Amino acid sequence: KVGEKLANIIVECAKYLMIILITMYTYECFTVFGYADGDKKRRILRNQNKLMFMIHFLAFAGMYLKIGEIKILIFYAVQVVLLLAIILLYTWIYPKASRLVVNNMCMLMTIGFIMITRLSYNKAVKQCVIAAGGVAISLAVPVIIRKVKQLSEWRWLYCGVGIVALAAVVVVGTEQFGAKLGFMVGGVGV
């Protein structure tokens, strides 16, 4: 009983601390534009990463205290590795990429991981695998386009395929939890 009460207090405190950390993260998204000094900007962007990982840790610590299953901690560690890999690979492969955009992408992924893990662990694992695959593709596509110049000339084809795919979701998509998110092709969800 005492352990459970302590866990509840920690979880409640973590909720408020996460709100404060998200506010600090958001504030730094705007303040980074106020500095011309590259070192100061890098410090702010690195601090954003620290804030993001603190939010991530607090959320998963709270889930672990509530659920008490080791799989939550393992899944947390996998996500940390994925997020670190994204930050490092994007800045290494694309040194001119906006670090703020990369940070915001990782922050949104973190929030998504937290939300879906709270709802369904199995769906969260599936989503994490999809996110890792999407990141791998997003890292490879620009390199491939640079190597095969003709691919960059097919913009209208990509646009058309995207519009047709979105229209297919609207027309034949199956509704789950009030949203049409995809459709089935030969028993495979798209």
Language model feature labels by segment:
Residues 16-33:
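N-terminal signal-anchor/start-transfer transmembrane helix
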